[in-house]
Amino acid sequence: MSQNVYQFIDLQRVDPPKKPLKIRKIEFVEIYEPFSEGQAKAQADRCLSCGNPYCEWKCPVHNYIPNWLKLANEGRIFEAAELSHQTNTLPEVCGRVCPQDRLCEGSCTLNDEFGAVTIGNIERYINDKAFEMGWRPDMSGVKQTGKKVAIIGAGPAGLACADVLTRNGVKAVVFDRHPEIGGLLTFGIPAFKLEKEVMTRRREIFTGMGIEFKLNTEVGRDVQLDDLLSDYDAVFLGVGTYQSMRGGLENEDADGVYAALPFLIANTKQLMGFGETRDEPFVSMEGKRVVVLGGGDTAMDCVRTSVRQGAKHVTCAYRRDEENMPGSRREVKNAREEGVEFKFNVQPLGIEVNGNGKVSGVKMVRTEMGEPDAKGRRRAEIVAGSEHIVPADAVIMAFGFRPHNMEWLAKHSVELDSQGRIIAPEGSDNAFQTSNPKIFAGGDIVRGSDLVVTAIAEGRKAADGIMNWLEV
């Protein structure tokens, strides 16, 4: 690292350049160019190597951030990748999709006055470069225990659990209903944030480590939980939350109203060459006036996907102001650049339809910000007499997700909470063990919809809980 302790003044924070707007608006490719070697080294050199690094504390997997920044600055890429993988199963993914402004970079000592270290982009650089140079996890010292665990769900929680188990000699077999690993990483997050080759490469790496994947395999249809409990020493549930939350709006089942997740999944499958399904039909927004209801990152994915499909006009409508919007500021900025219109402080009352029963608009009412709610965000209070119509040919509802019905789980004494989430306490003797001692769970199905990195953290901790229970 530099001997100049004021290097953060001499060298300002630099983000990687974005692809030109004319390309971004029509192609499903990652919009950020990767750092060059020189850029990565220089930006890593801005790190102060704080004695108590808040960036590590804020990261859900507690990455050794200053340490691998130092290695990156010195060009020791293999060592940096090795250290990165000690705490994170998917560092090249987190470097792309984590909301660093709310996590590591938001906690960087330099953030307020000098601009945070570009931690996420360096994390991406380290691991992409290491893979390109041939680095792979060293499994030569792993001793097999003879134990095997079935993992249901190849999303971030399931993959993280499989990773840790495999590195400790426990055979992991991962079942997933989709034709590729990743869960919502692959099929929910659009390619302009995470190109799908990233997860294809990951499957090859995991397979080389000894993880076995059984794709296009749905529990309850193609394989039964009874059989998994009989054939394996433990089962981990990393099934996520896929059921879209409804808005309770008049005419929300009208022709032209779509749920966010099926819309995104079908678009990605179409781009990857996979067929559509009855539950997830491909929908094109070409030439349409699109209104997306919601203010989270899923809403941002929907508006930006609609732009790339050729929508005539795209609007994001959110009931609070921009300051209280849950979506990443980076994603909001990108959407604005790509031509999305934002309407804040508007709440939907119902869907307007024409004589043929098709969407013609959204009935809205204006709101103003009131006192904070239980989560600390200011309430949206309706302004009387402010009803109005926003014209639309298509409406996408991005109100969040809840657990889907798992009939195959009911008879196995796995307790659920009032919202349908699996109860699997992190603080139990065996972390993330359910009321059925042979079944563990983690990620969104336990805590509700959350970040990719949080699911990774829970999957890794659940693996420790499984190994503790198996006494390996």
Swiss-Prot record:
User: Which pathway does this chain act in?
Assistant: Amino-acid biosynthesis; L-glutamate biosynthesis via GLT pathway; L-glutamate from 2-oxoglutarate and L-glutamine (NADP(+) route): step 1/1; Energy metabolism; nitrogen metabolism
Record text on cofactor binding? Binds 1 [4Fe-4S] cluster.
MF terms (GO), sorted A to Z: 4 iron, 4 sulfur cluster binding; glutamate synthase (NADPH) activity; metal ion binding
The enzyme class is: oxidoreductase
Outline the extent of the 4Fe-4S ferredoxin-type domain.
38-69
Name any cofactors this protein relies on: [4Fe-4S] cluster
What's a Pfam family this protein contains? Fer4_20
Q: Which GO terms describe its cellular component?
A: cytosol; glutamate synthase complex (NADPH)
The miscellaneous annotation reads: Glutamine binds to the large subunit and transfers the amido group to 2-oxoglutarate that apparently binds to the small subunit.
Quaternary structure?
Answer: Aggregate of 4 catalytic active heterodimers, consisting of a large and a small subunit.
Q: What does this protein do?
A: Catalyzes the conversion of L-glutamine and 2-oxoglutarate into two molecules of L-glutamate.
Q: Which PANTHER family is this protein grouped with?
A: GLUTAMATE SYNTHASE [NADPH] SMALL CHAIN, GLUTAMATE SYNTHASE [NADPH] SMALL CHAIN-RELATED
Which protein are we looking at? Glutamate synthase [NADPH] small chain
